[in-house]
Structure formats: structure tokens, C-alpha cells
């Protein structure tokens, strides 16, 4: 979302008003209504009351947030996590999304994740960590960018086999194996904050300290398959403008 211009954001919000709430909202509400959750990489405009077809922030009982750094490209965090003016602030937890060592088992009823799984070198490891900190049959509301509608449109969706191999080899977040592909195929005309080709290259080489890189690329098919292979039941999949794949799901015991 950070690559959208002001015009694109206004156009997107106008479309939200026209398209209304997502059909999958009915599947999401039982997972989060009046429950305690953890967000990964929040806050997200997509979950706010006036900003999307999936307004869930004001329906939760409580919400904490996990981010890798106190200050990122997208947000600067305090110790408290103010996600809604109508709900008490939660707390910010600073650790890697695939290594939630600061969080005990079964601490939450659900996990929210919006546009950050693509930034992880080992998404299966992350999903399994999210399951660990979630209570039995806990919910997962996952939003991913549809590659065809983003600066990744020249790339191909990453195979689930590849992502499973990353998990089996315990791939670390310092991985740059996708660097040549990204440098060649990234559409900088759709990612103005990335700067020039040289600036983009330098930023990507420093990915461990900024986490801007999209390691993997998703569409409806491989995102659903990835969750299934990771032991997660997919309840609904829905695409929405300008570039979102919403996956409403539940962690299986």
C-alpha cells in the first residue's frame, strides 16, 4: 500500500464506498468478535471502520501488535498499540514475525496479518509460530497483495513447494536468493518510494534492516494452497481493489 499515490488512495476509497463490505466479513466476524487478538505488522487501514470492506478493529475485545522494529518504513511504534479510538490500546511487541519467542503458547484467539507475509523469507515458519500463540481453533485473517495488481506483476507466483523447502531448510530472514529476480522484474513505475534503480538495489541489499523486499509472490491459488499445506483451514477467499487477497481461515488442531 505504501507505493500508492494520493490519487490512487482516493480512487481506492471511492471504490470501497461503492463495493461495500466484503462478502467474507460474515466468515471473519465469528473469529474475532469480542475476542483477544494479535496483529502482525499493524496497524492496517484495511481493518478500520471507514477504510475497507473488512472493518474489524472495533469488533475485537483487545488487540496487541507485533513488529520487527520499533521504527519501520511503514510505522513508528510506542509501547502501547492504539489501533482504534473506540478500543483500549493494546501493547506492541518487538520481535520477528517468524520467531515470537516473547509470546507464550495459546495467548490469543486470533491473528491478523495484512500485507506482511510476502516480506518474510520463511512464511511457513511464520504461520506455524502464529498457530503456536493462538488458542485451539483460533482464527487467522490474512491479507496478501495480488501480484498482478502490484509492482510484482512481471514475476510469477511462488510455488508452494519452494516455500515448503524454505521451511524445511530453516531459511533465515537474511535470505537474498530472490534478489536477482526482484532486481530484474520489479516495476519501479508502480513503486515510487523505492526511488531509482540504483536506490532500489541498495535498499534490497539491506533488506535485513528494512524488510521491504517481497520474497514471495501470491495469487488466489498459491495463497490458499500454502495455508492448507501449513495446516490451516481456509473458510473464504476474496479479492478486492486495488490489490488485495483476503483469506479468512482457522488454525486446525
Describe the function of each predicted region.
Residues 1-31:
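Membrane-proximal basic amphipathic "stem/tether" segments
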Residues 20-26, 46-51, 125-126:
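Short alpha-helical segments and helix-capping/turn motifs at coil-helix boundaries
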Residues 31-32, 105, 127:
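A short, aliphatic-rich alpha-helical micro-motif
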Residues 35-100:
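Class I SAM-dependent methyltransferase SAM/SAH-binding core
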Residues 111-112:
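Hydrophobic beta-strand segment of the Class I
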Residues 116-119, 144-146:
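Hydrophobic adenine-recognition pocket in adenosine-nucleotide-binding enzymes
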Residues 120-121, 134-136:
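Helix-to-beta-strand junctions that scaffold the AdoMet/dcAdoMet cofactor pocket
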